[in-house]
Amino acid sequence: MSLAVGSAQAQSVQTNEELVNELLTYGDANDDEIGNFDFLYRNNGKSLEYDELMVENIIDEAISHLGTRYVYGSKGPNSFDCSGFTSYVYKHQNNVYIGASSREQYAINQPIKRSEMQAGDLVFFTSPRSGRNVGHVGIVLDFDPITDTFTFIHASTKQGVKISKSTESYYQKRYVGVRRVK
C-alpha cells in the first residue's frame, strides 16, 4: 500500500502511529494532513473526500447525458432506458455493477430510509406497466430533509434523460424506495 500527502509517502505502514511518525519525519505534514491520515487509516483508506468525489463524478457523468433519447432496452451511451442509464453511469464512472433491470437494482442494493437519502443514491418508482412493482429508477441529485423532497436524473420514456422533482404528482404517487449502491 502506498499513500501520499504532499511529498510525504508512506509504504506498507503497519500502525497509525508509524504513519503519523513517518509524516512528521518528512517535515511536510501539517496538522490537517495528519488528521486526514488518521481518518483514512481508521476507515481503511476510504475518506469522506473520496466518497464526495465519487458521487460528484457520478452526478457529472449522469448530467453529461441530459437529453439523450430513450430507447427501451438500451444500455447507452447514445440511447438509454431507465435502468440502462443508471447502470451505465455507475459502470462507466466507478466500474461498479448495480444490476441490469430496475427490479434487480432495487433487489441487490442496500435499502436505506428516505430520510437518509443523499446524492448518488438510486430512487425507485412504479410505472404504468409495472403495477405495484418497481418499474423505474433514477439517480438522486439532492435531497432536502426539511421538506422531504429530492431531485433526480433519469431516462424518461417521452423526454429521454432529464431531471425531475419528487414533488411532481406523477412521481409522488409512484415512489417505492431508495437504495444505496454497495
Regions found by a protein language model. Give the residues of each.
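Aromatic- and glycine-rich peptidoglycan recognition patches
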Residues: L3-E18, E22-D32, V134-K182
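Mature, secreted membrane-active peptide modules
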Residues: Y41-A62, T68-V71, S79-C82
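Catalytic cysteine-centered active-site loop
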Residues: S64, T68-A119
